[in-house]
């Protein structure tokens, strides 16, 4: 949200995500400049109006068929997680991550994969 709305940065995070092997970005109905607010930037507290915004946004995620929602805003992550922890099981299967955490996870998974592979160095007898 803030990265885009206040700084005009929309494509750079998508480029980083697209660089991850095996990951496909599926845009929601409202994304980029048209993305709907989760309620935090609108300075709403966790009231019914903010909850309604989060539910609408999560329905957009559900419509994509994606199992993970990525956002550049850590406050959005907190707000959407709040919806999940309010006991609304409808969204329990959707993981919500900020882009940096997602990319860090990918790097760590790649490091683990590389560490578990046999070394490419051949053992040569003299």
Predicted segment positions?
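Iron-sulfur cluster-binding electron-transfer modules in prokaryotic oxidoreductases
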Residues: 1-126
């Amino acid at each position: 949200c803030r990265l885009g709305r206040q700084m005009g940065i929309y494509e750079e995070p998508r480029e980083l995500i697209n660089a991850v092997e095996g990951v496909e970005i599926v845009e929601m109905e409202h994304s980029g400049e048209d993305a709907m607010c989760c309620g935090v930037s609108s300075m709403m507290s966790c009231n019914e109006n903010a909850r309604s915004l989060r539910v609408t946004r999560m329905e957009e995620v559900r419509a994509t068929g994606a199992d993970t929602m990525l956002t550049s805003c850590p406050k959005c992550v907190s707000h959407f997680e709040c919806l999940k922890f309010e006991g609304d099981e409808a969204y329990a299967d959707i993981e919500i991550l900020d882009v940096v955490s997602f990319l860090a996870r990918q790097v760590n998974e790649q490091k683990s994969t590389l560490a578990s592979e046999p070394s490419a160095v051949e053992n040569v007898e003299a």
